[in-house]
Amino acid sequence: MFDVIVIGGGHAGVEASAAAARMGKKTLLLTTLIEQIGAASCNPAIGGLAKGHLVKELDAMGGFMGEITDEAGIQFRILNESKGVAVQGSRVQIDMDKYRIIARNKLLKLPNLEISQEQVSALIVENDKVKGVKTNLENIYFAKKVILTTGTFLNGLIHVGENKLQAGRVGELASVNLGNYLQTLGLKMGRLKTGTCPRVDATSIDFSVLEIQDGDVNPKAFSFRSRNFNPTQLPCYIARTNTTTHEIIKNNFYRAPLFTGQIEGVGPRYCPSIEDKINRFSDKESHHLFIEPQTIDATEYYINGFSTSLPYEVQTQMLHSVKGFENAKITRFGYAIEYDYIEPTELKHTLELKKIKNLYCAGQINGTTGYEEAAVQGFMAGINASLSIDMKEPLILRRDEAYIGVLIDDLVVKGTKEPYRMFTSRAEFRLLLREENAILRLGKYGYVLGLLSEQDFAYIQNIANNLQKGLEFLLSKEFTPNNQNNAFLESLGEDKISSIVNFQKIVARASFDIEKLKKLDPMFETMDNYSLREILNEAKYCHYISMQKAQVEKMKNLSELKIPENFDFKSVSGLSNEVVEKLNHHKPPTIFAASQISGITPAALDILQIYIKMQKKKA
């Protein structure tokens, strides 16, 4: 008898099984190929805009992805560095082979975790409660909780031109029996599609005609726990399609599964295939292609931006039309893959299914796309399954606390009909949810759960103390416009002042940096750069942060007004049939959750608030 069984060893499965095992739960990870644990099935990179935030938040609570990325990273960049800190994002090219090996080895060393190479064929469900699983080897395993992290494997169907192949990804069997079994549970399910790009032999690429894209000169680690960080970095390259490429693709639209009706699933809006781009943006004469090394030895390159399901011979033809790729040899062809998913409105915020008790879902099965989105869901599912076993309150992150909270709330409340990708624009309070303050926001949860060490938490507390001391100093001290103070400002390269201002106003200037902050007071010279960056950020955005915190308080009031689990919305007079239907479908746990549902009007919310408050008074 296991406490937790995790089905699938992708990024969600890695984090789910690790979290449960590290929280003291006897855990079993079942996966089709042990060698493929933690595999990056598509692009060789972790992070990016908003995705980097997710990894930082995961790391802040003790997840594995950030640490593994730092160990396997071969190029480190901060995206949007010229823009505000709220929308900057860390992105790391990884050695895909090394990443996989590190992930597998970290799991194999966990004392409470067993791993078995088996494919689950069915669940054992009694009275709407999951009790265990059955596998293709006819083994039966019982567990208190089961977490589905099946990725693209549920009835996975690969498309290349007119050809179709049942598979979870190339070279691995689709999970047909489990996919069919889930259809019998009365869950709302759908079909989604994603795709991948060709990989090319490095010796066949003419790099001399490509634009080089180097990593940052002073790379920053993803994980605050990474020690002795000094990575070897490789360049990426940029190529461009041209009108000849586009003509080849257009001439073969009739062979594209995307357009022939062969593919039924909905693809990712923000990561379209090259044929979809040519069709949708027919006026563009060129599209960027990012040429990314797959490993540190750089023998193969991933052609990012060239995702396709066109026939093999067409892929070769269109790639040869790109400058620098005239003699390119494709080592692995691109393809599209369709798979089953469960509509995420079927889930609670804990990621447990509403209809099947003790059954949790994480990753692409919930309608998301991306390694990072999958990893954080797996982590939260593993945590909440473990907390439930211990009869403890679940960990549900609010929208103002974390991008993880935004992601899960969007899925559970709004649902999705297309692969969901995280963006900074999805977060209402993104100035509060910066990458670098993730440890200050979420470290306490990781520590309480036993996923962060005493040493790690002490480091976080030290930064928090430095931040508090630094801000108190800046807000309490004043600059008067005398000759001595103005001379000091001029020595820093700053403009003089003509009226009394506090230090925070000086530090808030765009030109004020860490080196200048150190000269402001000896206290700052003793602080580490992490603390100093946070003091600068808080000082520069002080006014806007205060505004967002006021908005958060309003949201909290709505979030604290809970709607009873089996609430009868029909009993509320004044609500239209449409509103009642939507509320019954989504079953929002709070008034705030109800406010996020499309079509729920402010008037309906007012009526609902008044009714629930009256019922609470009567009780």
Swiss-Prot record:
Residues engaged in binding FAD: G8, G9, G10, H11, A12, G13, V120, S175, Q364
SUPFAM superfamilies (alphabetical): FAD/NAD(P)-binding domain
UniProt binding sites for NAD(+): 267-281
Cofactor dependency: FAD
Gene label: mnmG
Alphabetical list of NCBIfam families matching this protein: mnmG_gidA (TIGR00136)
Annotated SMART domains: GIDA_assoc_3
Subunit-level organization: Homodimer. Heterotetramer of two MnmE and two MnmG subunits.
Matching InterPro entries: FAD/NAD-bd_sf, GIDA_C_N, MnmG, MnmG-rel, MnmG-rel_CS, MnmG_C, MnmG_C_subdom, MnmG_C_subdom_sf
Annotated compartments: Cytoplasm
Main location (coarse class): cytoplasm
Native species: Campylobacter jejuni subsp. doylei (strain ATCC BAA-1458 / RM4099 / 269.97)
Name the UniProt record assigns to this protein: tRNA uridine 5-carboxymethylaminomethyl modification enzyme MnmG
Gene3D superfamilies for this protein: FAD/NAD(P)-binding domain (3.50.50.60), GidA associated domain, C-terminal subdomain (1.10.150.570), tRNA uridine 5-carboxymethylaminomethyl modification enzyme MnmG/GidA (1.10.10.1800)
Keywords carried by this UniProt record: Cytoplasm, FAD, Flavoprotein, NAD, tRNA processing
UniProt key word Flavoprotein: yes
GO MF terms, alphabetically ordered: flavin adenine dinucleotide binding
Function in brief: NAD-binding protein involved in the addition of a carboxymethylaminomethyl (cmnm) group at the wobble position (U34) of certain tRNAs, forming tRNA-cmnm(5)s(2)U34.
Gene Ontology cellular component terms for the protein in this record: cytosol
GO BP of this protein: tRNA methylation; tRNA wobble uridine modification
Family to which the UniProt record says this protein belongs: Belongs to the MnmG family.
